[in-house]
């Protein structure tokens, strides 16, 4: 009896709480590669100012060589993932690393599929 009451209570509660319009949840990343890239982007953003200042000291030829060497050691002490070179553009739907259209952040395969089915506004196939 208690299980029946609990089930009916949950059903009524579920009907009262509005769900999202599409029913899709987009709070997770596609795979671990995308999550790793997101962490790298965050770290590169955090260390961007510090890295810029240290690199300007390293590349300044007017400063003494000893100071440039100290700046080299400081840049080497920073985390590897703080370097923006390690960031890779990935498709937001499939996490594919190659053939990504930068403007839409989609791989060429997903982009073509969505464009063919009219799901990208303003995009249509060329006809001549």
UniProtKB/Swiss-Prot annotation:
A biological-process GO annotation: translation
Keywords: Disease variant, Mitochondrion, Primary mitochondrial disease, Ribonucleoprotein, Ribosomal protein
GO cellular component, one term: mitochondrial small ribosomal subunit
Location of this chain's protein in the cell: Mitochondrion
Membrane-traversing stretches: none
SUPFAM superfamilies listed in its UniProt record: Glucocorticoid receptor-like (DNA-binding domain) (SSF57716)
InterPro entries on file: Ribosomal_uS14
GO function term, MF aspect, one: RNA binding
Pfam family, one: Ribosomal_S14
Pathological association: Combined oxidative phosphorylation deficiency 38: An autosomal recessive disorder due to mitochondrial dysfunction and characterized by perinatal hypertrophic cardiomyopathy, growth retardation, muscle hypotonia, elevated lactate, dysmorphy and intellectual disability.
Assembly mode: Component of the mitochondrial small ribosomal subunit (mt-SSU). Mature mammalian 55S mitochondrial ribosomes consist of a small (28S) and a large (39S) subunit. The 28S small subunit contains a 12S ribosomal RNA (12S mt-rRNA) and 30 different proteins. The 39S large subunit contains a 16S rRNA (16S mt-rRNA), a copy of mitochondrial valine transfer RNA (mt-tRNA(Val)), which plays an integral structural role, and 52 different proteins. Interacts with LIAT1.
UniProt cross-references to PANTHER family, sorted A to Z: 30S RIBOSOMAL PROTEIN S14, SMALL RIBOSOMAL SUBUNIT PROTEIN US14M
Family per record: Belongs to the universal ribosomal protein uS14 family.
The protein's name in its UniProt record: Small ribosomal subunit protein uS14m
